[in-house]
């Protein structure tokens, strides 16, 4: 059997195992013949998606029906709910008898095949033997985290967050396997650029890529300058395109918690750093210059940097009450 056939078999088997396990949560989402979202966040996502698909309100980024009477900006960016609404409308155009909630509650289960394919692609990019890839796929299928993210009714956006984590790793590895191919660098930049449109915090995916390039720079083993510049340009432009539909961005807001000018600023920093690494060779003088530039660029977002550090170190009391911040293994035992 060829390697491609083995990888295809691993993907199919592991995806079906993961999907079957995720279907175990059906009883939490199917009550008295009615499909319902599983959890508070999933409920609000479903409400916003259904409004965008069928209601006169259409798609909204400011909700005047929450935090009454003043209303509130929705911290979740536009892309996930908008695309889900478009997907629902398209599906019902072909299959008009489909129950809208039946469709939405099962999207996370179907999406297992996408995330599993990316995981297999990552393992293949690492040149692992097929039995190791099979073991990784089985671990993904049996993981409580997979069941938590992909369970029936989990309309929350977290399974798509996982998609972008895997997509960035996959595109980065493919590029580094063939660093001369500028098109692969561009795909990495696009993945990094559009990720915040699905969750504000996904701009953080730029950090490990920058760290990786910084290590290559110190070792004098960077990819060619053309590929580096292609990465920088595609990252900035795709971020800008992802920001254009965002009302907070068009209103001139600069907030970490909203898809705004903050995210374009982060992309600009990453673009500048990548360009500097591509233009200047490593030495003590250039290292000092790069460090100085980095510190100056952090000043406008220093408060957000401190807040992010507190989040990573779990120095926020509120985290104890947020399900997403808890161990998936604890969840699997106590559910």
Stretches found by the model and what they are:
Residues 46, 80, 132-135, 315-316:
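Alpha-helix initiation and N-capping motif
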Residues 16-114, 143, 156-159, 163:
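Membrane-interface coil-to-helix junctions
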Residues 1-29, 134, 276-294:
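Start-transfer (signal-anchor) and selected internal transmembrane alpha helices
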Residues 10, 177-179, 222:
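Conserved acidic
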Residues 161, 186, 191-335:
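Transmembrane catalytic cores of multi-pass membrane glycosyltransferases
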Residues 3, 65, 73, 93, ...:
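Membrane-helix interfacial "entry" motifs
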Residues 14-22, 107-126, 131-176, 181-217, ...:
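Membrane-embedded helix bundles of polyisoprenyl
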């Amino acid at each position: 059997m060829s390697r491609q056939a083995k990888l295809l078999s691993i993907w199919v088997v592991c995806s079906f195992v993961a999907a079957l396990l995720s279907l175990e949560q059906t009883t939490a989402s199917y009550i008295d013949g009615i499909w319902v979202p599983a959890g508070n966040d999933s409920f609000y996502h479903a409400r916003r998606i259904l409004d965008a698909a069928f209601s006169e309100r259409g798609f909204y980024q400011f909700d005047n029906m929450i935090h009454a009477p003043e209303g509130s900006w929705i911290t979740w960016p536009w892309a996930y709910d908008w695309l889900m609404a478009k997907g629902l409308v398209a599906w019902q155009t072909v299959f008009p008898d489909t129950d809208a909630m039946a469709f939405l509650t099962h999207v996370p289960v179907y999406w297992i095949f996408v995330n599993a394919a990316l995981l297999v692609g990552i393992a293949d990019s690492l040149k692992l033997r097929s039995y190791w890839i099979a073991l990784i796929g089985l671990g993904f299928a049996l993981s409580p985290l997979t069941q938590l993210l992909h369970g029936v009714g989990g309309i929350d956006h977290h399974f798509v967050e996982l998609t972008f984590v895997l997509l960035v790793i996959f595109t980065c590895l493919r590029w580094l396997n063939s660093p001369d191919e500028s098109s692969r660098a561009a795909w990495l930049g696009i993945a990094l650029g559009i990720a915040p449109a699905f969750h504000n915090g996904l701009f953080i995916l730029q950090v490990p890529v920058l760290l990786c390039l910084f290590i290559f720079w110190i070792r004098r083993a960077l990819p060619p300058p053309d590929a580096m510049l292609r990465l920088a340009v595609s990252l900035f432009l795709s971020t800008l395109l992802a920001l254009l539909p965002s009302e907070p961005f068009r209103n001139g807001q600069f907030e970490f918690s909203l898809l705004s000018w903050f995210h374009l600023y982060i992309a600009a920093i990453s673009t500048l750093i990548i360009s500097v690494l591509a233009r200047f060779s490593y030495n003590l003088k250039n290292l000092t210059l790069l460090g100085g530039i980095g510190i100056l660029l952090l000043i406008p977002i220093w408060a957000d940097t401190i807040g992010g550090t507190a989040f990573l170190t779990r120095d926020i009391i509120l985290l104890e009450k947020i399900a997403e911040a808890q161990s998936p293994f604890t969840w699997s035992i106590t559910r």
